Amino acid sequence: MLQTKDYEFWFVTGSQHLYGEETLELVDQHAKSICEGLSGISSRYKITHKPVVTSPETIRELLREAEYSETCAGIITWMHTFSPAKMWIEGLSSYQKPLMHLHTQYNRDIPWGTIDMDFMNSNQSAHGDREYGYINSRMGLSRKVIAGYWDDEEVKKEMSQWMDTAAALNESRHIKVARFGDNMRHVAVTDGDKVGAHIQFGWQVDGYGIGDLVEVMDRITDDEVDTLYAEYDRLYVISEETKRDEAKVASIKEQAKIELGLTAFLEQGGYTAFTTSFEVLHGMKQLPGLAVQRLMEKGYGFAGEGDWKTAALVRMMKIMAKGKRTSFMEDYTYHFEPGNEMILGSHMLEVCPTVALDQPKIEVHSLSIGGKEDPARLVFNGISGSAIQASIVDIGGRFRLVLNEVNGQEIEKDMPNLPVARVLWKPEPSLKTAAEAWILAGGAHHTCLSYELTAEQMLDWAEMAGIESVLISRDTTIHKLKHELKWNEALYRLQK
């Protein structure tokens, strides 16, 4: 798997000197206790307790330190007592990383029999957080507000998901996309403003001729290929019939050579996402298939036909999902059976095996597109369950994230003449409304499909990144969506 930085999140508690040292010590103890209680909510990122801030100077210095820290991916703020919000203005003015406002309190219940004014004075986040919330709103700051008892499982889940999103935002600012060949000729939606994306997201897109990859592949040894083929044999199903067929074994080994060449090329250039094009294969024996699936399984972002936006999006979502159950996808064909409308998603070859229901099979079949030799690919049916589809498009002067909540379906019918990876789903609120809404929003035919992430996480990411977002869900109606798109258009024109 591709590795990401070991990020941390700083837990910052606000108060003021008015309460005296004894109360401030209690506030700090409570903050430490909460941090300890939250320590296990993320398998990857830790929450670091910071001293209670009580003045404009301490707030400014702490937020400045967080802003310049290489490992701090964001801060979690909480007002245990009342913290006059004017103290936060200077610090928040220069802070640009993800910000969470945790609206909670140390105690879950009111101590009915013993409560007194001392308790009230030292446990007043119910109105201290409102003061802090006001100044955030007054300053127009983007932030995540989570309300509830800090030890509640739902609150912990929300916090963990936000941390994954914030870390992915930080990490994705360093995404580099290697683009082998250009855009598929005459295709509109896969093109876009690369300079704008570099400014907005930090995504760097570099173009290469396919010969640059072939040159690296030519240096791969037979021993390296044989070793990787043996790994394929351990991890996936290769039929005995295929193993006896020298031409098919050679085809699988050619994909191993492509995988090794791609890996070497990407590692050397520091790339974590890439695109290919079936129109640009000079010097290649096959269209990359199995090789691409393997790299996605390791965490690389990918999209076909030069679609650099989707490739970067897949990489970003894989960071957020910790590499789990997330893949490049394409809406391919519809099932219009009344009351059971579904979409079959696939691509020519390139669907990530992290969404496979069972152990994938390596098969070799002809592929008319590209005009090359028969390519090896992983063949499998996709899993069922709740998922999201995400598409990022250049809508002219800005980027738009289009989301659709979907429900993955178990594939119950055999498709013996379709030897590719395939996934079946029902979109919310229905195929008819979802398709109409998607088309009205300008969503692409290439997407990232994830069973691991939620629409809320992606909406949070869009807000952090400063781009427009459109969600198609069970509550969507075409009438409301059209108005939303018009309002968004007006808003972004005003912001120019």
Curated annotation (Swiss-Prot):
Which residues are noted in the entry as Mn(2+)-binding? 305, 330, 347, 446
What CDD domains does the record tag this protein with?
L-arabinose_isomerase
Q: Report any Pfam family annotated for this entry.
A: AraA_N
Any idea which UniProt keywords this protein has?
A: Arabinose catabolism, Carbohydrate metabolism, Isomerase, Manganese, Metal-binding
Residue span of the signal peptide, if any?
none
Keyword DNA damage included in the entry's annotation: no
As to how many cofactors bind and how, the note says: Binds 1 Mn(2+) ion per subunit.
Q: What class of enzyme is it?
A: isomerase
Protein's UniProt name: L-arabinose isomerase
